[in-house]
Amino acid sequence: MRLSNGLGWVLNEMRRLEDKPCLAYNLNMTIHILKGKATVLQMQEMLVSFPDMRMVKIVVDIENEILAGGSGMHYECEQLLLEDGSKQENLWGANWFPDEQSVEFESLINIRPRQNKSIIIQDENICNEVERITRKFLGDIKP
């Protein structure tokens, strides 16, 4: 039976896919907090969440130069950094594509009433800092 509302559709899809592996979001993920260059093993573990896309969701603390990555959701990395002592206004979400060595500055955690009104980081200086720190910790690592 298909329910008419959006939630019903989600529940039906969950039942239908119950025994099938999910390729888009792997629950066996490992989130790493990096304060220095990542190892090849760390990069491989961070890629587990999105193996088909070869992408790592990251959150960068631009004040303390710390990076968390490897979750299926940016907010999980954000929460770990907040628990580690980071301040919300210094945390920015992005995606790292190791094969292309490129950064995409897009995440829901980037929406802030006073700092940024979009999921894409609008301030060029913040983008530059996120990219610099990301390349410092993840650049040139071939998993």
Language-model-derived ranges and their functions:
Residues 25-26:
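Short, positively charged and aromatic/hydrophobic N-terminal segments
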Residues 35-80:
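Negatively charged, low-complexity tracts enriched in Asp/Glu with abundant Ser/Thr
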Residues 70-102:
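Amphipathic, interaction-prone secondary-structure segments
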Residues 98-121:
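Intrinsically disordered, low-complexity regulatory segments enriched in Ser/Thr/Pro
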Residues 124-143:
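Well-ordered alpha/beta subsegment
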